[in-house]
A protein has these predicted regions:
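Radical SAM enzyme [4Fe-4S]-AdoMet core and its adjacent flexible, acidic
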Residues: 1-78, 89
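Flexible mid-to-C-terminal extensions adjoining Fe-S/redox cofactors in radical SAM and related proteins
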Residues: 72-122
Length: 122
């Protein structure tokens, strides 16, 4: 991921932002979820590395559609709530989270088996 960010920053001089997007479980993705989904924890360091690479390149990076509880704390400042608030879903476990008002939550299409369990930030 950071190689893509580095390449983008070096080759494309007109880039004004890099966006990392969470995977929504609709259409083809839902049908193939078990073969394409990757646990967030398994690539959290890669996200941090991409953020650091973007910063060195001077390109703003924004993380969309990731619950804060599944991002490393150092990446929270790059995460933003979805522009489509009707898509946001907060399981009941999120009610006790101190960061809920800043969090993108989960895609409403992910209710049930298509998201990782919430880890409320207390």
């Amino acid at each position: 991921l950071d190689d893509i960010v580095e390449f983008t920053g070096r080759v494309f001089s007109n880039i004004n932002q890099i966006s990392l997007m969470g995977l929504e479980s609709i259409g083809w993705a839902r049908k193939n979820w078990s073969s394409i989904f990757v646990e967030h924890d398994s690539y959290s360091e890669k996200i941090l590395s991409a953020v650091e690479t973007a910063q060195r390149s001077g390109i703003p990076l924004t993380i969309f559609n990731y619950p804060l509880c599944h991002l490393p704390e150092r990446a929270w400042g790059f995460a933003t709530q979805s522009i489509s608030d009707w898509k946001n879903y907060y399981p009941k476990e999120c009610d006790e989270c101190t960061q809920k008002s800043f969090c993108a939550g989960y895609f409403s299409s992910s209710k049930g088996r298509f998201h990782q369990p919430p880890r409320p930030i207390i």
